[in-house]
Amino acid sequence: MTLDLLEQLESKIQNTVDTIALLQMEVEELKEDKQVLTEKGEQLQAENIRLTEEHQKWQSRLSALVGKIEETES
């Protein structure tokens, strides 16, 4: 009876150890995914800033052109 209990306990402990190992691998994968997503997010933010600045420049140029057109029409 005691031997059976010890074998059951050993089996449960081994299952727990295996589960912990799998969870640790999953955590590492998730950390890597998080790093990739963080880098991608930073790239997208930089691209957004660049595009916003470019948009503002074009708006300024267009406003200047509209102003010149209005001056010539006056």
Curated annotation (Swiss-Prot):
GO terms for cellular component: cytoplasm. It is found in: Cytoplasm. Its main location: cytoplasm. It comes from the Bacteria. GO terms for biological process: division septum assembly; FtsZ-dependent cytokinesis. Gene3D superfamilies: 1.20.5.340. Keywords: Cell cycle, Cell division, Coiled coil, Cytoplasm, Septation. Residues 2-74 form a coiled coil. The keyword Protein biosynthesis does not apply. Pfam families: ZapB. Belongs to the ZapB family. Non-essential, abundant cell division factor that is required for proper Z-ring formation. It is recruited early to the divisome by direct interaction with FtsZ, stimulating Z-ring assembly and thereby promoting cell division earlier in the cell cycle. Its recruitment to the Z-ring requires functional FtsA or ZipA. Homodimer. The ends of the coiled-coil dimer bind to each other, forming polymers. Interacts with FtsZ. This is Cell division protein ZapB. It comes from Psychromonas ingrahamii (strain DSM 17664 / CCUG 51855 / 37). The gene is zapB.
